[in-house]
Amino acid sequence: MDQTRTLGKTKLKVKRIGFGANAVGGHNLFPNLNDETGKDLVRTALDGGVNFIDTAFIYGLGRSEELIGEVVQERGVRNELIIATKGAHKEVDGSIELDNSREFLRSEVEKSLKRLKTDYIDLYYVHFPDGKTPLAEVAGTLKELKDEGKIKAIGASNLDYQQLQDFNADGYLEVFQAEYSLIQRDAEKELLPYCEKQGISFIPYFPLASGLLTGKFTQDTVFDDFRKDKPQFQGETFIHNLKKVDKLKAVAEEKQADTAHVALAWLLTRPAIDAIIPGAKRPEQLQDNLKTLNIELTEDEVNFISDIFK
């Protein structure tokens, strides 16, 4: 498959397999994370030819950005990378609140620039809507930052269909991020078609449905993290999903490939999806994700896989 793509209407050229860096410094998301292991993940990504790194303030409340900034500075490769980060969260009296105000987002971008040790951010997303600030106004704030050269492209994440249209009222939106995988296909109803029509690049998160599409789980698998609260990992739904994954596994075996690679390769055949950003907690997982680029799916295989998960 094509190794690189331009993200939608932007001038950002990315390798189609990026790196979702929530396990780099994301101590508030995962137990027992080690900063040096996190930095090794970034180094492994760079060594593997990854040029698209996705992070956010909420990943360790800025720690992920700091660790990425340290490695990028150490390697001297800033100009070769596309770095995406996100903002909207703030700490207030020990709790996390959302803020999309102009003053807050401008301040957050400045803080992200410092943490990442850079003078520009390639792609900046509003991570979540705050439910108060008009979304066209939020997009306008990012347009100001783009015009000033602080960010190169405008992104938004976690919007419903109406919110997506509101954010893009002036046509400023360039990249949109939402949950999408073979297991979770709600985006196909309205979000993906809208992005395709508008020339907006769609970046799916949870592309492996939080590991469900790796084929490594059984009915006896016990989850002790956020997955235990997700419906797709519970009761009959979980068993039903495992049966579908078994069918996907059979397709992968025919192609002498891993189940996860086939699931990711399927995503890269979808309209508007220029790149994906699977996460990893260990360097070997990250190296493994890169093997997806070796998978070629025929049209019949793409349709067969789609039908399994209808």
Curated annotation (Swiss-Prot):
Sequence similarity: Belongs to the aldo/keto reductase family. Aldo/keto reductase 2 subfamily.
Alphabetical keyword list: NADP, Oxidoreductase
One Pfam family named in its UniProt record: Aldo_ket_red
Species per Swiss-Prot/TrEMBL record: Bacillus subtilis (strain 168)
Sequence positions that bind NADP(+): F206, P207, L208, A209, S210, G211, L212, L213, T214, G215, K216
Keyword field contains Transcription regulation: no
PANTHER family (alphabetical): NAD(P)-LINKED OXIDOREDUCTASE SUPERFAMILY PROTEIN (PTHR43364:SF4), NADH-SPECIFIC METHYLGLYOXAL REDUCTASE-RELATED (PTHR43364)
Single GO molecular function: oxidoreductase activity
Domain of life: Bacteria
EC numbers on record: 1.-.-.-
Enzyme class: oxidoreductase
GO cellular component, one term: cytosol
Stated name of the protein: Uncharacterized oxidoreductase YccK
Gene, per the UniProt record: yccK
Active-site positions on this chain: Y59
